[in-house]
From Swiss-Prot:
Similarity section: Belongs to the universal ribosomal protein uS11 family.
One cellular component (GO) term of this entry: chloroplast
Location (main, coarse): plastid
Subcellular location: Plastid, Chloroplast
One MF annotation (Gene Ontology) recorded for this entry: structural constituent of ribosome
Protein name as catalogued: Small ribosomal subunit protein uS11c
PROSITE patterns listed in its UniProt record: RIBOSOMAL_S11
Subunit structure comment from the entry: Part of the 30S ribosomal subunit.
Any GO BP annotation: translation
UniProt keyword list: Chloroplast, Plastid, Ribonucleoprotein, Ribosomal protein, RNA-binding, rRNA-binding
Length: 138
């Protein structure tokens, strides 16, 4: 016999969700993935478990506006606002990708009040691997 599906607002579900939100985390890692079309900001604890994330698309930007620096700044602000409420004070920043949102996201992270222990560029660089896509002719 299948288990009954718990009600949405049940006591058990409320207890689980409150435990997840109550987790204090003084240190974390912020990953910024800046592509030409979108910027994704992921915040994890030191063990690598995702605590919060945001992208320019989830912040309401559509189409070509997702690749703009302002969209990256908004996404970084939204992702960090959640973890500052949980008590994050120090963070390491890993930036990946060639997009326009790299600097804007880093600026938003610095402005949030979190102390940055280091900022590392982890953009993958080929040692002459795959052939790149052809250049655009406009």
């Amino acid at each position: 016999m299948a288990k009954p599906i718990p009600r949405i607002g049940s006591q058990r579900n409320r207890r689980i969700n409150s435990r997840k939100n109550a987790r204090k985390m003084p240190k974390g890692v912020i990953y910024v993935q800046a592509g030409f079309n979108n910027t994704i900001v992921t915040v994890t604890d030191v063990r690598g478990r995702v605590v919060s994330w945001a992208s320019a698309g989830t912040c309401g930007f559509k189409g070509a506006k997702r690749g703009t620096p302002f969209a990256a700044q908004t996404a970084a602000g939204n992702a960090i606002r959640k973890v500052v409420d949980q008590g994050m004070q120090r963070a390491e920043v890993m930036i990946k990708g060639p997009g326009l949102g790299r600097d804007a996201a880093l600026r938003a992270i610095r402005r949030s009040g979190i102390l940055l222990s280091f900022v590392r560029d982890v953009t993958p660089m080929p040692h002459n691997g795959c052939r790149p896509p052809k250049k655009r002719r406009v």
